[in-house]
Amino acid sequence: MGKVIGIDLGTTNSAMAVYEGNEAKIIANKEGKNTTPSIVAFTDKGEILVGESAKRQAVTNPEKTIYSIKRIMGLMFNEDKAKEAEKRLPYKIVDRNGACAIEISGKVYTPQEISAKILMKLKEDAESYLGESVTEAVITVPAYFNDSQRKATKEAGTIAGLNVLRIINEPTSAALAYGLDKKESEKIMVYDLGGGTFDVTVLETGDNVVEVLATGGDAFLGGDDFDNRVIDFLASEFKSETGIEIKNDVMALQRLKEAAENAKKELSSAMETEINLPFITADATGPKHLVKKLTRAKFESLTEDLMEETISKIESVIKDAGLTKNEISEVVMVGGSTRIPKVQERVKAFINKELNKSVNPDEVVAVGASIQGGVLKGDVKDVLLLDVTPLSLGIETLGGVMTKVIDRGTTIPAKKSQVFSTAEDNQPAVSIMVLQGERELARDNKSLGKFDLQGIAPAPRGVPQIEVTFDIDANGILTVSAQDKNTGKSQEIKISGSSGLSDSEIEKMVKDAELHKEEDARKKEVIEARNHADSLAHQTQKSLDEHKTNLNENDANEIQNAINALKDCVKNDNATKAELEDKTKLLAQAAQKLGEAMANKNNAEQPKKKDDDVIDAEVE
C-alpha cells in the first residue's frame, strides 16, 4: 500500500495533504501553491486546462470555463437549485438521464467527469511532489451532502484513477486535524463556510476519539452566494445608470464575478474598495465603463441574511447535540469565507467566545483527510472517528408517508431493519421507495431510488412480513434490501443516487480519462517542440542579421529559407511533433555555416597573442 493522500475537493479551491513521518503535510501543486482553483477550461484548440491556467483565461472564454461544478454534483435537473445554478453560471447546464450535466461544444460532460479532471491534476501534482505513484485517497465532502452527492464524488475519484478509501465529512476532517492531540475531553464546534457549501458540526474530542454529536448545514450556501449579492448589486446599479442589463453578456458577467470576488476579499482588510471595469459593454452611444465604490458596511447589508442563516443553523445543531452554547469549549473556523470580518463577529457574538483561528481555513480539511488516510493505512494508531448520518433515511409507506428507518444523527457505519407488510389483499409485489430527509410526507423528501420485491405469496393485507434493511457504510453510502420472510425471496438496491451513472459508464469514463491523459501528453510534446523551434528560428534570424556579411550569398539564402520554413511550420496549428523536429533539424544543420562564420570572425578580431617568453619590464 503506497501513500494515501487526503483531498479537499472544494467548490472554489481544492487542496491535498499526505501523512508521513508522523505528521500531516500539505502538498504544494506544480505551481508551488497550497491550493488549486477548482476550475476546468476547454480551449478552442482542444486543450483542457485545470487550475490556475484555467482561471487566467476565464474572462475571454467564459462559456467553456467550468467553475463551481460541485454545486451541481449529484443534482437532479428538475430541482430548484439546478434552475438557480443555471441562471448564475455562464456555461450550459443540460439534462442527462434526469441529472444535471454540462454541454461544451456539443459534448455532454457529467459533474463527475469535470471533478475527475481536477482530481487528476491533484493526483499528478502529488505524484510529482512525492516522487511515487498515487492510487489511493480520502476525499472530503460537505457534511450535508446527500447520498447521491457522496456517490457522485466517489465516482469522480474512480474516473480520475483513484481508489477512494473513504468519503469523510469536511467539518469532521477539520476536527480530526484540530483535535488529534487533545487528551482532555472537550466539545468543539466546527463552523465551515466554504466557496459553495456551509456546514456546522458539534463534536466531542479527547483520548484520540473524535465523535460527531450533531451536524447540519446547507449544500448551497457559500462564498459564491456572497459574490452573487455583489454581482446583483453592481448589475442593478449599472442598469439604473445606463439602462443596460450586463448580466445577459457572459463575458461581462465573468468580469463581474471576478471583480465581486476580489472586492469581497479586499473588504476583509479594508473599509472600502473600488470596482473599476473599463469597457464592460457598449451601446449605440459608445463604450460603457463600470466604476463603483463598495464599502464594507454596504457589503454586510447585502449579505446579512446569508450570515443570519448560518447562525440559525448553529442554533439548531447545538440543540440537536443536546447541548447549550455555554458547553461549547472551542469554535474552529474553517473555509475561506470565514475570513469575512462580519461572519467572525456574528459567530463570536452568538457563541460568546473567542474564535479559534489557529488552523489555516484553506488547508485544515485536507490535513484531516490525510490523517484519516493514515488511520486507514495503519500509520496513525488508536484514533477512532465516529461520524453520523446528516439526514434521516426511510421509505414511503401507505398514504405517501415517510417512515424513518435510520434517524438523523445515527453513528455510521450503521445497519437497521424494520418489518412492513402489504396494503392490499393478495398483493403480489411491493415497491420500495427509498427517501432521505426530515419531512413527514414522502413527496417533500429526496428520493434516492426505487426497487420492487416480486413474488409475494397470496395473503390478506397485513399478513406478509417484508423486512426492509438499511445498511450505511463508513462513506455514508447506502444499500437497501427487502426480504419476504415467508418465501425467503429478497431484492436489494445499492443506492447510486441521482448521478445516473452505471458501472459501465464509469468504466468508460475511466478509460476516456486515461486516453485523454495520453493525448494531453502528446499535445504537451508538440507544444514543447513548437516552443523549441520558435526559439531556434528567432535566435538564428537574429544571428543571421548580425553576421550576414560574413557569409556567401548562397549560404545566407539557404539559412534564410530554412528559417522561413521553420517559422511557417511553427505557425501551422496542425503541424506534428515530427514535422517540427524535422524542420528544426534542417535549420540547425544549415545554421552550422553561420556558426563557423561567426567563429572565424571572432578569431580574426582577437589581438595577436604575445610571445610567452617576452617579459614586460622597465629597463634602466
Curated annotation (Swiss-Prot):
Q: A Pfam family for this UniProt protein? A: HSP70
Annotated keywords:
ATP-binding, Chaperone, Nucleotide-binding, Phosphoprotein, Stress response
Q: What conditions trigger expression of this protein?
A: By stress conditions e.g. heat shock.
UniProt-listed InterPro entries: ATPase_NBD, Chaperone_DnaK, Heat_shock_70_CS, HSP70_C_sf, HSP70_peptide-bd_sf, Hsp_70_fam
Q: Where is this region: Disordered?
A: 597-620
* Secretion signal span: none
User: Where on the chain is Phosphothreonine found, per UniProt?
Assistant: T197
Q: What does this protein do?
A: Acts as a chaperone.
- The family this protein is said to belong to: Belongs to the heat shock protein 70 family.
* Name of the protein in its database record: Chaperone protein DnaK
**Organism source for this protein?**
Helicobacter pylori (strain P12)
Traced from the root, the source organism's taxonomic lineage reads: Bacteria, Pseudomonadati, Campylobacterota, Epsilonproteobacteria, Campylobacterales
